[in-house]
Amino acid sequence: MNNRSKQDNQVDLLGHLGNSSKYMIQHHHRDNLSEFVLHDLCSEQGFKIRKAAYLINNPDFNCLKGVAGFYHPEIFPGMVWQNPKDFTSHMLKSPFNQHVRSYTDTSLPAISSKVFSKKELQGIVDYLEIEDAAYHTWQSKHNNQGLFIFERPQDVIVSQDHLYNFLHMLSFCPVF
């Protein structure tokens, strides 16, 4: 891919993701806002991630909870932000999303502020059946940590820094 195409892809991606904050404000009352944001993040217009899970690690309550899941074969066929009721119904029927949401365990002990035990993470990856898994963690509100486990995209068109920076948007979503 030539340099101009990479720049075009980055401009398109950042334009797409830039709209997310506007949509998040418009739909702030939705309990499942994290599903909307995750869908945006992983879609063809986003980072083209085939399978991903968003979890919250809460050391204060010794709890690790699955919040939202995305799996490309179960993708919503319309525009999620323009069809919020249909999207919400769709996600309630999404087997992978429900599988992620059903995940509950004790809190992951942090080796450092950004690193969890590979053994602990591998158990989650196996449960979620994510191939060629990568993960990223970040500090969230109320002393929680966000945990994003995803299947590495085949075509890495944009910098992972963009992905990791955008993941913080999930911290603004309610956990339901």
Name each model feature, range by range.
Residues 19, 59, 112-115, 172:
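Terminal helices and disordered tails flanking the catalytic cores of nucleotide-processing hydrolases
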